[in-house]
């Protein structure tokens, strides 16, 4: 009897945890409105290193990327001008090595700054993570860091 009661309690607890997890919001996608879809696609695919994934529209106006488990980045063509905004509003990608990423930027002729705005410098956060900031072809700010988690 005790064993059956314990089994029921464990099952009820697991069901409650599962139901609780399903009610939390999760990130599905980020969308960026871009002027030149091909330039933006090359930036995120070839420079940042994201994998493209199928998009349902097949209209030449969208590129989708996987950016994590069940999370995507959607590029949407049609912007009539560059994005203007402060780097406090940015998207961030973690890479195995900021130094190796900086080498890719140098080969591509793409400048970067640290948090203080110093050109070609790297910020080292208080937790030891190194980070840089750059802008994509449309002016969106992108942070690249070497955070492990």
Task: Give, region by region, the residue ranges found by the protein language model.
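Exposed loop/turn and edge beta-strand positions of beta-sandwich/beta-sheet ligand-binding modules
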Residues: 59, 87, 128-129
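N-terminal beta-strand motif that seeds the catalytic metal site of vicinal oxygen chelate
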Residues: 19-38, 89-91
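Mid-chain, structured segments of secreted extracytoplasmic proteins
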Residues: 62-108
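Bacterial Sec-dependent N-terminal signal peptides
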Residues: 1-22
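Vicinal oxygen chelate
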Residues: 36-38, 91-138, 149
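Core segments of cupin and vicinal oxygen chelate
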Residues: 31-72
């Amino acid at each position: 009897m005790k064993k059956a009661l314990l089994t029921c309690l464990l099952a009820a607890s697991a069901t409650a945890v599962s139901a609780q997890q399903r009610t939390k919001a999760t990130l599905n996608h980020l969308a960026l409105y871009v002027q030149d879809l091909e330039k933006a696609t090359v930036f995120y695919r070839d420079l940042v290193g994201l994998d493209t994934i199928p998009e349902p529209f097949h209209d030449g106006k969208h590129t989708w990327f996987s950016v994590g488990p069940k999370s995507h980045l959607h590029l949407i063509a049609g912007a009539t001008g560059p994005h203007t905004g402060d780097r406090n509003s940015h998207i961030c990608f973690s890479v195995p090595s900021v130094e190796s990423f900086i080498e890719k930027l140098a080969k591509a002729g793409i400048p970067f700054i640290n948090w203080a705005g110093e050109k070609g410098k790297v910020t080292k956060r208080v937790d030891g993570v190194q980070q840089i900031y750059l802008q994509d072809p449309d002016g969106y700010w992108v942070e690249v860091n070497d955070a492990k988690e």
